Amino acid sequence: MTSAHEATPKAALYANVGADLTRYDVDVANAELIKRDTVTLPAGVQYAWPHASRRYLYVASSSSASGYGRAGTEHHVTAFAIDPATGALRQHGAPIPLPTRPIHISSDIPSENLLVAFNNPSGVRVYRINKDFSPGEEVAQPGPIDAGIFAHQVRVTPDNRLAILVTRGNEGTPTKAEDPGALKVFEYTNGVLANVVSIAPDGGKDFGPRHLDFHPTMPWMYVSIETQNKMVMYRMEPGRIEPGIAFRSDTLAEPGNIRARQAAGAVHVHPNGRFVYGANRAEATVEYQGKKVFKGGENSIVVYAIDQETGEQTPIQHIETQKIHPRTFHIHPSGRLMVAQHNLPVNVRDGDAVRTVAAGLSVFRIDDDGKLAFARTYDVDVGDKRMFWMGMVPLPA
């Protein structure tokens, strides 16, 4: 942890409502966010990723609805220069068009290329980052890409040798069989992808991975299994992911009390490598007094302690986020603060009455033992739009 005698690293927080991306200052000591200014994208923000230099932010946007909803026609990556003192954003170059809705964007380790995941149809493409840091042309791939079903995230391993496409598949319904999920692993060489292996236990049955993160110093990868509400750990070797699950844990506080659809979400490892965090999401509604109200379930952050010898994750806390559906969350680079973002306003029962829980941001302090202490919420009026992404970017020292 950062001691009181060390300077707290500065970071800017960015959160969207539809196509608008707003910057907030982050006051770690007081666990406060201060709203500043807003830039507007060509369409709704889907995800964003900073350049390794921390001086540019690449934002994926789309006019498509989420999931398998209405398909739009506007899909782009837009670059912004980050003011190193304040975090203010200034558009840098022209947006580049994409073929369909980008669900996730990241860069390789040196930020020479952008990797973009698409959910419908499932896919991954690589785009050069130009010498002037603007997004550039697509990298031609030598052969077909095995992109699975419903890609949700793409990441390059810390050694820059593999790219991993997290493909969730789809849960089964009374009228449609389950679509299998998988981790699609590719050799990665300067933007060129080559199929290596599909990690899909039992053929991907009951395996719906959504999001992963890497330990900062050890060869350990943590993956949330959205459709089974699990957190799993994989061991890594140079240029290889061991295909067997090393450790598996529940994400829910009450895995035997599923009140409505639960979905494990984002995963982030603490900067000190001692803890890993995951999101639990629920938003299903039922009719009550002529209104749709929250059916119940866990909207929480689960905290795991990481065994520093084995990498095994052990749950030590579940804490409610105070709002509904924490789609994204992020840890401040100081390791002392977490912020969670929530998509939409939802009606909830309050005794015999009904009240609305607004979309917005929840702020938590992170204690030395890794546990979270709730600090405050910020309501955000999303109108007919939604919050979809939030993240913090360290500013250059």
Model-derived regions: residue spans:
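Asp-box/WD-like beta-propeller blade repeats and closely related beta-sheet repeat scaffolds
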Residues: 88-158
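Beta-rich catalytic cores
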Residues: 9, 44-46, 101-103, 150, ...
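Short, solvent-exposed loop/turn segments at conserved positions within beta-propeller repeat blades
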Residues: 15-17, 66-75, 117-122, 172-181, ...
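Surface loop/turn motifs at the tips and blade-to-blade linkers of beta-strand repeat domains
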Residues: 38-42, 94-99, 142-147, 199-205, ...
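Short loop/turn segments immediately following beta-strands, especially the blade-tip
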Residues: 24-31, 79-87, 126-136, 185-193, ...
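Residue-level detector of Asp-centered blade-edge/turn motifs that repeat once per structural unit
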Residues: 7-9, 51-54, 107-111, 158-160, ...
